[in-house]
């Protein structure tokens, strides 16, 4: 389809090679195979990698490693992650900080440039990451700063989500918490934001 062709072109422009999932993409030049939670163990590429003795790592482990090498802001929460991740990335870009981006949703401005949209390699050591909670792997991340937007039942129960998000804040050097969400009230934070009086930063301050 046209959409698939466009995505392929954008990925190739980003430097990604596209291969059929039949194991043919695993060759002597392959160093490591990275998979997401959605990839089953029976996948032909995984079988080829294991047969060749190549390491197979989860996407979250690769991302955790990247996060450690950068000055990273991780955005988490049940909803609004992609939007706030994009906002922070655009703010830093406007301030000429040349950040990198790893997000779940594509940014329109980047797509208009023919890029894939949800990943961008900037010229500085700043990185803005959308930290997805759906498979629980965000607890592997140790960012410089984390932003927790909200908690509501979605991929997991609220109690389990609270543990995941709080763990992320405890592994962060600095954290910002939505003071309007009572489910986050017990979280320790460096700064709070929201509309209510409990928030350290509110829209009417700007």
Language model: regions and residue ranges:
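Phosphate-binding loop of NTP-binding sites
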Residues: 13, 20, 25-30, 37-191, ...
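Short acidic/polar mixed-charge low-complexity motifs
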Residues: 125, 197-199
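NAD(P)-binding Rossmann-fold cofactor-contacting core
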Residues: 1-10, 99
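Active-site glycine/GP-rich loop and adjacent strand/helix microenvironment
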Residues: 196, 205-206
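Thr-Gly-centered strand-to-loop micro-motif
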Residues: 1, 35-36
């Amino acid at each position: 389809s046209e959409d698939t062709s466009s995505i392929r072109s954008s990925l190739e422009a980003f430097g990604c090679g596209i291969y059929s999932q039949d194991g043919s993409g695993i060759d002597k030049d392959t160093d490591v195979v990275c998979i997401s939670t959605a990839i089953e163990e029976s996948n032909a590429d995984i079988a080829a990698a294991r047969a060749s003795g190549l390491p197979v790592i989860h996407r979250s482990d690769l991302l955790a490693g990247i996060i450690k090498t950068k000055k990273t802001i991780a955005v988490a929460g049940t909803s609004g992650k992609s939007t706030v991740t994009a906002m922070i990335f655009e703010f830093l870009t406007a301030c000429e900080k040349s950040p990198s981006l790893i997000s779940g949703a594509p940014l329109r401005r980047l797509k208009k440039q023919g890029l894939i949209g949800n990943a961008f390699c900037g010229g500085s050591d700043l990185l803005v990451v959308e930290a997805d909670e759906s498979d629980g792997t965000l607890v592997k991340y140790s960012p410089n700063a984390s932003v927790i937007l909200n908690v509501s039942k979605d991929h997991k129960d609220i109690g389990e989500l609270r543990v995941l998000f709080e763990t992320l804040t405890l592994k962060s050097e600095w954290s910002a918490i939505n003071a309007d969400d009572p489910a986050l009230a017990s979280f320790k934070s460096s700064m709070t934001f929201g509309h209510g009086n409990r928030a350290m930063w509110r829209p009417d301050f700007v």
